[in-house]
Amino acid sequence: MNKHSVINFFEEFISIPSVSTQKERFSEVLKAADFLKNKLSSLGFKVKLIQEKNQPPLVLAEKFVGGRKTIGIYGHYDVQPEDPISEWKTPPFKLTIKNGKIYGRGVADNKGHIVQNITAIEELIKENNLKNNIIFLIEGEEESASSNFEKYTKKAKDILSKVDVFYLTDVGMIKKNIPTIYYALRGIVYFELRIWIGKNDLHSGSYGNLVLNPAQVLCEFL
């Protein structure tokens, strides 16, 4: 393994401020997707971007080597905003190695893991030792609720249906040097609730406490 080439790969990836929650950085999100597409293509993967108009694309890459099993690897190339910038001791979008540790936005969530996975596959390819088929599924809106993820995966169902097992490295560890296998994560639920009481406006001084107040109903509901 060429350490310098891995660091350069990591450094360039971290330098892209692919913040999916900020519209002004949408071009950077696209840049990160193209960066991964080019990297995986150079390793012999068949890569395509699945995208809705003005939305972060899904990077779908496949490499079939006639293996008995097909392994799917999930990741996300978008990152959280760097705010508050005053709390950073190193530049957020510049890879910094300090006291044996690597710093930068996305190092732990989730660009660092993507670099690890791609580098591992790259080494297996170089050694002619890749025994399983590989499919990368890397989205660009995990930090913004994965709004199009279900739609994208349905479009890719012909490829994804070939996967025997999926794994993701987007979680933490119990302790340093103790790998941890997660079997589930909590999800997210959001909704909009509207409450109507009656058809007409009523004077609060005359009808207060006599009829239901939507504000009170909402407070009791919550």
Q: Predicted segment positions?
A:
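N-terminal helical capping/dimerization or prosegment-like subdomains
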Residues: 1-85
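Predominant activation on well-ordered alpha-helical scaffold segments within soluble catalytic domains
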Residues: 11, 37, 115-118, 122, ...
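Beta-strand secondary-structure signal
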Residues: 11, 60, 135, 190-194
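Short connector loops/turns at beta-strand edges and beta->alpha or beta->beta junctions
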Residues: 12-15, 93-95, 196-200
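Active-site metal-coordination/substrate-binding segment of hydrolases
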Residues: 70-138
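Acidic/histidine-rich catalytic neighborhood of metal-dependent amide-processing enzymes
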Residues: 110-184
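Midchain, well-structured core segments that form catalytic/ion-binding scaffolds
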Residues: 150, 158-222
